[in-house]
Amino acid sequence: MRARKCGSSGRNDKEGEVVSVIYVSGDTHGEIGRFCERNMPGESTWGEQDKLIICGDFGFVFAPEEYEGAMRQERWKLDQLEKKPYQILFVSGNHENFERLQRAEQVPLYGGTAFRIRSNIFLLRRGEIYEIEGKKIFTMGGAYSIDRHMRIPYQSWWPQELPDEEEYHRAIRTLEEADKIVDVIITHTAPQTIIRMLGHVPDPHDQELTGFLEWVMHEVHFRKWYFGHWHVDQEVTLKITACWFDVHDIM
């Protein structure tokens, strides 16, 4: 497995066959300009066999439905993303409209279940393991909004930002069924130890989730872990990487 900033296109193997690549990047917050060659080097060469995973705060399904202007703008942005040849996958962050996301159609995807947002855009459920291009990828979105006091419930903040009991149970069951062995972990926030290594203090409101991720870090065998949320691009350890603008591949 290889993890690097995306740049040169390694699209063909030694026999000249097209190679499928899984790319990973951080929070996009509904910014359509992120999905271009300037901000994602090599993006213009990605094809229908390629996948891009966003580590939460996708942000293109955010506006309350009664905000007609914002909804029109979001539909236009999603229309543009649906024209991309590659598949866009994302875990939930904390700045998402969970009511709208959870009403999306649930479909089988890569051995798990996902929410279909558009024909090529899917929300990956919490606590699932997806097998994508031969890689077992465990997903656990969500985080606590430290700015929730500035937000309006069900207009700019939703309580489903943190996992519920069912999602924790699903995660534990799924990991145990996989003998606690995966290739890649994708989350929005990070384990408590990693948060401290970034120079932050774990928020007590978030401790159930960050504590669970701490357990995952110690109990699960994994090769790479990517997370967003903290708006920094940093290789925290040899195996764990904070993502924001950088694009990494996990061929």
Give each language-model segment a name:
Residues 20-29, 134-143, 186-188, 241-244:
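Active-site-proximal beta-strand elements of phosphoester/diester hydrolases
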Residues 24, 52-55, 184-188, 226:
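Structural motif
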